Amino acid sequence: MKIKTLSAISLTVIPSLILANFCHPFPSSQANSTGESSIFNGELEEGAVIKVLENDTAISKGYFAELIAAFNEAYSDYNITAVDANTDQYVDLANDGPYGYGPDVLYQANDVIMQYAEDQHIYPLPVEELDAYDTTSSAAWKAFEVEKDGTTYTCGVPVNVQTPMLYYRKDLLPSDWQENWDDNNNDIPDMIETWSSLLEFSQERHAENSSQYGYMESLYDSYFSSGFLFSYGAYIFGDDNTDTNDIGFAAGDAEKGAKIIQQLASAMNEESIDDTITTSAYSKLADGTYFATMSTPDVYSTFLDELIKAYENEGKSEEEAKELASENLVMVSLPQLPESGDLTDDSSELIDTKTMGGVNGYAISAYTNYPNASLAFINFATSYENIVKRYEMLGIVPTREDVVKEIGGVTEVVYENLENDNIVLMPSNSAVSQIWTPTQTFFADITKDVFRSESDKKYKTNEDLKQGLEKVTQQISDAIHTLE
């Protein structure tokens, strides 16, 4: 791959005083006499060894090894080497960085990166000069932006969109689905188009064989279940996710979304209350116990590998197994919901399902000794060629529009959902950490309620669900503001 000079990648317009107030204070030796920052001056630090933190899937599937090998070859003339940071993917940069144990470059979700930015542990970046700048979704860039003293800074470089997707087995569809499960005659199974049909199919499949299920999901998981609330008017924080005094999990008709969760749970078992399904979904989808589940695009390769193994265990050759798995494992955007909020209402208008989502990307630690070499690595890793390879090996949904147009299909649909605000991005502030426990507790409780006896049920009406969501909102507010 051709190396492009990074001499143009500089921060010549940002006074060091502003930067010092925003991110980790820069040593005085890194500020020039005119008061301009020279952190990113394009002068590659020869001999640099860049510690890069990647996610576990990229490492286990071999993508990361190929990436750093290619980078090291491309930058061998500078004696610059990228290595695996060899730390947990959830490393605590705030505590590790100052002591030299943290990575130079980290790949994380936008909410994690921006919490580091808020606490001054990563650098704002001169992103306009990166190869990916003009081709990357504006919504994705926004996920890494923060305003300080009237100036907008970007503290991360987007790589891929994370959002819930429906995974299903095409070979587990009923043989007569085109006659009995395609009401609008569009050659798409009804159970893939609407949650109402998926619930009906799930009930029928389990009735025919009590050991098998249709759609299965860990409903307690806020990341996957919050979208049902958002679809009916809920939100996380007001003012574009910046006003933590305005918490919106009970807003609009959010209780309809909570009711949807309960209706879906009625065709599952009690494993839907906790994370059991999250951990078993790969093997259960592969062995046919589940017809469908919900997960994120970046684990497509894991589902695929499990299905390949299942076919091989049935006696298929490796080549046959791979071909069958690629054909029968399908990842699509989520089905539509009834506007009425009742999955048994066949007459209702349909609405799109909104989802919680995030943007994963790269950032640079404020504690690195090699900012320019680190920026060179990010520029290399987010190039067209390497994002295509990341897609091919991991099944991600890229944030580069040129790659998305090349791939097409469901990837393009997800990209459009991001641009059209059907993906509700996780807030880029520290307050987001307070939403998980109250919402997970609520989702687990309303799911468990489905399996309680009638006399023990806590949520018998939509009003009960509304009151439960209002309590969740208060709990989040208390957690955010009590110690202020």
Label each PLM-derived region with a short phrase.
Residues 35-40, 108-176, 193-196, 320-324, ...:
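Hinge/lid segment of periplasmic solute-binding proteins
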Residues 42, 126-136, 175, 180-191, ...:
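Short, solvent-exposed loop/beta-turn-alpha elements that line the ligand-binding surface or hinge
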Residues 45-58, 78-83, 105, 155:
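Short, well-ordered beta-strand elements
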Residues 70-139, 175-181, 284, 291-292, ...:
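Extracytoplasmic "Venus flytrap"/periplasmic binding protein-like
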Residues 148, 312-397:
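Extracytoplasmic/periplasmic substrate-recognition and gating elements
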Residues 149-160, 164, 193-253:
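Extracytoplasmic/periplasmic solute-binding protein
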Residues 199-205, 241-278, 284, 334:
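Glycine-centered hinge/linker elements that transmit conformational signals in sensory
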Residues 388, 401, 405, 418-484:
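Conserved C-terminal helix/tail region of periplasmic/extracytoplasmic solute-binding proteins
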